Amino acid sequence: NVRENLTLPLLLDGRNVNKNQLEQLAQILGIQDRMNHLPHQLSGGQQQRVSIGRALITSPALLLADEPTGNLDSKNSAEVMALLRYFHEKKGQTLLVITHDERIACQADRLITVEDGHIAQDEAVRP
């Protein structure tokens, strides 16, 4: 279920689950009412939020997001990017997003374009 999915990284690392932290994360992700649901009972956007939560439960300094909105509609894409921005801005986590979607790329502070395995462009997008 969602609860087990979110806490798996902590358990694999031999760390205790802080129930308050888990509840707060679920609230921020908007999945607090889905904690006992199985993956097939979740929408694509909810599944993506669970994946993000699983990546964030250990409070990493760096979050690597490879195509985080790849299979989502525009509404869910915007919600996922808002969640990632929240954790970047409020929790101070560095976010590295890999995407082919220009709408997602232009939301970055810095944009690095890679072509044929080489950096073709490196620019600040937002101050």
What are these regions (language model features)?
Residues 2-107, 111-113:
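ABC family nucleotide-binding domain
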Residues 111-123:
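H-loop (His-switch) and adjacent beta-strand-loop-beta switch element
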